Amino acid sequence: MLKMESTQQMVSSIINTSFEAAVVAATSTLELMGIQYDYNEVFTRVKSKFDYVMDDSGVKNNLLGKAITIAQALNGKFGSAIRNRNWMTDSKTVAKLDEDVSKLRMTLSSKGIDQKMRVLNACFSVKRIPGKSSSIIKCTRLMKDKIEGGEVEVDDSYVDEKMEIDTIDWKSRYDQLEKRFEALKQRVNEKYNTWVQKAKKVNENMYSLQNVISQQQNQISDLQQYCNKLEADLQGKFSSLVSSVEWYLRSMELPDDVKNDIEQQLNSIDAINPINAIDDIESLIRNLIQDYDRTFLMLKGLLKQCNYEYAYE
């Protein structure tokens, strides 16, 4: 004979396997989403939620009860199976309906709608009376069946107990929210003041940089004016130099072709650009030195032909 504990152990094994599958599904989903996680924390959270949903929804007890019914049927005790004939049709329909009911129960439990709330909503409904603030509480067919089946008890002590909504201290909650709001407001003001100080500092640095740039521009302008004046003075000096040399050249007893050659070189001096003028003067001086050297060589050769000697004093 099949022991009753064996079927219950099989159901417990299936439930545990479902929990492990839920943990694997949760961790693999987090990995696919690129979210870092602590396996122990995920395991603990999933286990807590899984145990609560399975217990509160009644799915665990329902499965264990069916395991007991199957074990009794296999052992020749058909009483439980006969009692459940009202909802039995065939195995496929029962499995599908059972799956849907379990899914709905677990969904409601995961949304915070616990077993107490589901039972009360299934047993009672409220009918509003038009024109009145009061209402009529109606019992459903399920409540009637429970009363007839002796599943309803009267708890006189429950009347004296305060409802959860009456124990809520709204003033303390308001004070907490007000403190949180004030703290948030203070943090926002601190960040705003910090931003204002940074903005002021940036403006001060910008104004300081503008002053430095303005001073540098003034210095550059003064230097440009000095350079322009210096260039004008050099142009005047070069023009005066050319005129003075030309006047001095005309007073010399040199041949006209020599004077003309020197005047052409003087007139070729660029009096506008000082750099070019210096190059032209350098070229003129080189030519004069070269002419002087040639003249000296000619004079030296002439003295030698005349059997004269020369000496520098």
Curated annotation (Swiss-Prot):
Keyword Coiled coil: yes
Residue span of region Interaction with host ZC3H7B: 170-234
Pfam families: Rota_NSP3
Keyword list, A-Z: Coiled coil, Host cytoplasm, Host-virus interaction, RNA-binding, Translation regulation
Cross-referenced InterPro entries: NSP3_N_rotavirus, NSP3_sf, Rotavirus_NSP3
GO biological process assignments: regulation of translation
Stretches of the chain forming a coiled coil according to its record: 166-237
Keyword field contains Glycoprotein: no
GO cellular component terms attached to this protein's record: host cell cytoplasm
Region feature Dimerization, mapped onto this chain: 150-206
Region (Interaction with host EIF4G1): 208-313
Signal peptide range in chain numbering: none
RNA-binding: region residues: 1-149
Subcellular location: Host cytoplasm
GO molecular function, one term: RNA binding
Family: Belongs to the rotavirus NSP3 family.
SUBUNIT field: Homodimer. Interacts (via the coiled-coil region) with host ZC3H7B (via LD motif). Interacts with host EIF4G1.
Protein role: Plays an important role in stimulating the translation of viral mRNAs. These mRNAs are capped but not polyadenylated, instead terminating in a conserved sequence 'GACC' at the 3' that is recognized by NSP3, which competes with host PABPC1 for EIF4G1 binding. The interaction between NSP3 and host EIF4G1 stabilizes the EIF4E-EIF4G1 interaction, thereby facilitating the initiation of capped mRNA translation.
Record's protein name: Non-structural protein 3
Native species: Rotavirus A (strain RVA/Human/United States/Wa/1974/G1P1A[8]) (RV-A)
